[in-house]
Amino acid sequence: MGEEYAIKCDRFTRKFGKLTAVDGIDLRIKKGELFGFLGPNGAGKTTTIKMLTTLLTPTEGEATVAGFDIKTDAALVRSKIGVVPQEFALFKELTAMENLWYIGELFGMKKDELERKSEELLKIVGLYLKKDILTESFSGGMKQRLSVAAGLLHTPEILFLDEPTTGLDPQSRIAIRELTQKLNATGITIVYTTHDMEEADKLCKRIAIMDYGSIKAEGTPHELKEKYGGGHRIELELGPHDEQLLEELKTVANANEVSQENGIVVIHVTSVGGGLIHTISSFLAKKKVKVKEMDITEPSLEEVFINVTSKQVRD
């Protein structure tokens, strides 16, 4: 059986003078995962990516990427990864196709292979019909999609996307997210950094929440919400009932709290698993209390972030 992990980090640290930008993180990212680093600007996400892509050397700790040590096998690491940085690394005086040809030549790709691969990637990112247009006229979203194509030219095993939707309009953001999911479905491991909670929730299979250089929590979006979100909220609009019902509901639902807000009964529970909704519905049916409407709200990643970092999200 081959190596299970695309990326492994142990005690991964980077200091700039007295400032510790990344503080001894331990991390495992499985092959084929779409893994997200979530956190505000200054959390250490980009510094972590720069170390994993060999642009920065860690002050302490070890890491392997695609099975190679980032310190001793940096060239081999670079041959296995694609990188799409925050800033567009494109030449505005070149066309979309010419940009890819130039970058492919830097990888040492042969002409026939480069032309074939460039056409294939431009079709994948939806820019084939724009291949002969100068990139200076491209929108931010088009430039980002072209940057993704450039990062895929040499068929990497792992693709790093650093804040790829920052500053883009809503349509372009959706296009980049859909492209990311499409690429991940082909088996490419994707490491995705963002400070957008909703984006991370919808896109990433697993997430590491970073702040001040440390990983504060890690897991699937569902796991993070269950563990750190503060519980679910069940709202019930009920028919006529006596005041004692709220206390009975608290016991039946094993609730943290049951209250009434503007005529709506609100049940706060840690989890809605284990047939809880059926239990509540059956109890109310036996009490002959009509349920006019029921709404279940799960905690958001923003609530998770606030709970694990004890503060509001920064820009």
Residue ranges of each PLM-predicted region?
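ABC transporter nucleotide-binding domains
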Residues: 4-217
